[in-house]
Amino acid sequence: MTSEPSTSSEAGSSSLLDADKTNLLQEALVRAGVIRSQRQGISPTATNIKSPKKSALFEKIASHPLMPIVELLLEKCETAATTFDRKAFETDDIKRLFQSLEQRGVQLSSNRDEVDELMETAILALRTCMVELERVYSLMESFKAKYLATLRRTVCHEALVGNNGDSDDELSDNPLMPVLEMSEAAFQAQNKAMESALATLQSVSGSLSLPLQFTHQSITAAQIERNLEFLKQCGFPTQLPPNFLKPSNEKSPEKSEEEKSQKPSSSPKSPSLSD
């Protein structure tokens, strides 16, 4: 029964110690900024130092050998979180700082205290933040690449097919206007492209791609005369050459299938035999 209060008190004291360490680290960073601004000739900001004991801890943390690494990691985390620049995730400057500390012979004290553990924990936490920010940056770059690829495919599809596609809801007033406004060279190029297009035929086993060749059908004079009004509405030249229909009238071409269906031939009557 007596062990439970002791464990709860130990947990509470450990949480208080962690909170105190965090506050001490924050205040030490502020103190380090004040010292750095004093060295650079900048007016320092006011800091609240409540007791000589805390002042001694501030000085100890600010003058710790690992304090420059903590400041550099904090600066890199802030730059990476605000700008997402690729250079912010490089660790060459951190390696150079470690090498410079080793060359100057800076080492931790043999008897490790809470300040040493606090600085090492801060470095590990900041390095973990850098790794997580780099993962977010990689995911963002991957999403941007996939989105741009999809956008390029969509733009190419709209440039080839059109933004209306096959929808019947958004029909223009005159669907033939884009065709009529095309130049002759562009119209011929489009015809050549259509002749070499591929038509997908649906079969039982699957889809089969076959070249679709558009065969040129001969148009009779009767069809031209019947569709002359439609050609005028579409904007085609209405003035035909004077001898355009003459050869066809002289040759008396065969009637089209449509004319045959409209005017069925009547069976000739057999001559009556005289009695």
Swiss-Prot record:
Domain MEIS N-terminal: 91-161
GO biological process: regulation of asymmetric cell division
Xref: InterPro entries: PKNOX/Meis_N (IPR032453)
Subcellular location: Nucleus
Chain intervals with Basic and acidic residues compositional bias: 248-262
Low complexity bias (residue ranges): 263-275
Disruption phenotype: RNAi-mediated knockdown results in absence of phasmid socket cells.
Annotated keywords: Nucleus, Transcription, Transcription regulation
Gene Ontology molecular function terms on file: transcription coactivator binding
Source domain of life: Eukaryota
GO CC terms, sorted: nucleus
Region Disordered: start-end pairs: 239-275
Assembly description: Interacts with homeobox protein ceh-20; the interaction is direct, facilitates nuclear localization of ceh-20 and may stabilize interaction of a ceh-20-nob-1 complex with DNA.
Role summary: Probable transcription coregulator. Required for asymmetric cell divisions of the T hypodermal cells, and cell fate determination, in concert with homeobox proteins nob-1 and ceh-20. Acts downstream of the Wnt signaling pathway, and of ceh-20 and nob-1.
Protein's name in the database: Transcriptional coregulator psa-3
Protein source organism: Caenorhabditis elegans
Phylogenetic classification of the source organism: Eukaryota, Metazoa, Ecdysozoa, Nematoda, Chromadorea
